[in-house]
Each structure stands twice: as structure tokens, then as C-alpha cells.
Amino acid sequence: MEAGRTAVLRVKRKLGTEPAEALVLACKRLRSSAVELETPKTSPEGLERAAENNVFQLVATVRSQEEPVQPLLRAALRPSQGSQQRIRHHLRASAREIRQEGRYRVVFSRRSSGIPSDSLESEDASGTAKAADDANFQLLDLVHEEDAEVAAAAISCKKSDPDVILCNCVELIREGLNVSQCGPSSGHQKEQKDDFVYDIYCLERATPGWIENILSVQPYSHEWELVNDDQQPEDIYDDEDDENSENNWRNEYPEEENSDEDEDSRGSDNYSSSEERDNSRQPMWSKYPLDVQKEFDYDSPHDLDSD
């Protein structure tokens, strides 16, 4: 089985801060010249590629930049596919939040310079070792830069020296005098140098091409899901948009027809009531002359007209 292209990140981190278990590097891939010769020529539109996300897994942490990374990569690449699946499962199942803050800055990039071709090895199912191709190795050096607030918090949480005398949580001047009397020495410089460690992150690329045009480097969290960013908004289901709900705006119908029917019904009721009153008045009005005739002892209705 041919070994894929391997990319390595070496991050310079201040001692005492938590390392990120994985880094997500967004970049645009640049195809190598050898691959361009093998592949057929394509149009300029086909050569343009969108940004892609690459997940680098934490392999190990070393104390010095001079320490070789080949043995660490050899152990990490031996069960290549199984390791990535196991690490991904561990990252997603972990409930611990990454406390890493700040940003990562790329300071150096190298493609297989000064690394022997037989330094990187990967074993197949039978256990035989194969030398990795020297042209398929890329190393990038990064520096983790902390924010000012995070750096101040890290300094405040640093373990105190038992020889330091404090008064109301304030260090006495004696410690400052001792530091001023001691000139710069190699021991002090070595102590400052030992304040940093180097985290090694590895990615075995199955697709050809070098990592170029780095856009961003971010810590990988267990909530990070590499989904398609081109997902259409209409494909996303909204929990609140329930068509069967009574409060949904789709279920609100206009009440104009009902109001017209109510007005018609009220008008017909008024008309019928007025007709009933008129009908009741007619017999009463027709009966009125007879009542008057009887009361005043008139013989005929003409006598009422003469009066």
C-alpha cells in the first residue's frame, strides 16, 4: 500500500498551557508538478479549488526543537487508518472543553529538507516495513500566541516559589533586589528556553498536493463537525416551523368572509323583526276605528270623519 502524502505541524507552545488535541487547518491545495504531468490538462476554471479543512491529530510533545520527529511519526503512521478513527472517536466522545485560546502563526515551512528518505516508515498487515518517499513529507513550524488576558491568568496561576515572602499577597522587594544583583547568566537563559515545548501534529494526506495558502488554524473541539458549508437554507429544518401547530402563521386564515356572513345574518334578523312589528301594527290600526265608535256611540264610521 502506497503511503500518502504526510504533513506535520510543529507548534511552539508556552509551558503550562493546555495543548489542543487537534488542529483544523483551512487552506487551498497546490498541486505538485509531478502530479500535473500525470494528470490531463484542465481548464483554468477546473484548476481553481475551494478552501478545504484538514484535521491534524496531536502525536506527541517534545522539549526541544532539535529532537527528531521521525520516530514519533513512525509510531503514529503505523496503524494509520485505525489511529485516525480512534482519535476522532475520542475527540467527539470527550466532554472536556478545550481551554486553548489565542491564535497560531506559521513561521516556517519545509518540504522534506534534511530528512532521510528511510526515516518515515509504515507497516502493512504482514508486518514488513516500507520506506516512505522523501518527496511526500512537509513540515510546518507554528507559534502559538496567547491573548494578553490568557497570559496574565496563566502567570497568576503559576506555582509560587516557596522562598518568596509575601505580604497581603504582594511580593516583597527582597526578591526584586536579588534578581537585580544577579546578572544575565546562561542558567537564566536556559530557564527561559525551557519555558516552551513543541507539539507535533500529523496528517496523512491521501490526496496529492502540498499545503499552500493557509487561511486559518483553529483548535479542534468535540462539537466541530466538518459539514458542507454550501448547504442551502431551505434544507435546514426549523423546529419552531411546525405546520400542525395552532400558533403557526400558516394556520391563520382571514376572517373577512365570516364577518360578511355575520353582517348578512344580522341584517336579515333586523328585517324580519321589523316585518313582524308592522304586521302586528296593522290589525291594531284597523281595530282602532271600531273601538272609538263604540266608545262615543257613533252609528257609522262616517260620523268619525265629519267630526
Swiss-Prot record:
GO terms for biological process: developmental process; hematopoietic progenitor cell differentiation; protein transport. Belongs to the IWR1/SLC7A6OS family. It is found in: Cytoplasm; Nucleus. This is Probable RNA polymerase II nuclear localization protein SLC7A6OS. Directs RNA polymerase II nuclear import. The modification Phosphoserine is found at S300, S306. It comes from the Eukaryota. InterPro entries: SLC7A6OS, TF_Iwr1_dom. Residues 233-307 are annotated as: Disordered. Residues 233-245, 254-264 have a biased composition (Acidic residues). PANTHER family: RNA POLYMERASE II NUCLEAR LOCALIZATION PROTEIN SLC7A6OS-RELATED. Residues 292-307 have a biased composition (Basic and acidic residues). Pfam families: Iwr1 (PF08574). It comes from Bos taurus. Keywords: Cytoplasm, Nucleus, Phosphoprotein, Protein transport, Transport. One of its GO terms (cellular component) is nucleus.
